[in-house]
Amino acid sequence: MKRIKNVLIFFLAMVMLGACRDKKSEKKEEENIQQENTFVNPLKTEGAQCWANYYDGWYYYMQEAVDRLELWRTRDITDLEHAEHKVIWIPKDPSNAHHLWGPEIHPIAGKWYVYYAASDDNMDNHQLFVLENSSADPFEGEFELKGRISTDKNNNWAIHPNVFEH
């Protein structure tokens, strides 16, 4: 009985000793490990699924947004964080007004086109869409929805558009 009592006291002492550890240094250690294993984009600290295009002395940049499309431009890509930017499209049609992903801007035949994926708020219904701006400068004029891009007869899930000239 005395042996069980001693083992129990020893066990309780170990539990109490473990509870006295320095949680601040443990948290700091975890943060250091995360910082060592995390890449921070030096050009822009926030933004997913980004796209950059260099045209006529300007860098044009787009990134994912939940409910709108924004465009940045700068002559110095290393100063993207401070670049001029504007909202170029806010969808009004509920079929393409949610989860705007992977926008890309392309100058083609004197016009500007933005390709992106969006849904009707059901993640299974992502489709591709295209906007057009007839202005030579994408910061001038207005982007107009040209429509959904049909990728197949079953309207399967479609994301991450890209175009090329042939």
Where are these regions (language model features)?
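Carbohydrate-active catalytic/glycan-binding domains of CAZyme proteins
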Residues: C20-H166
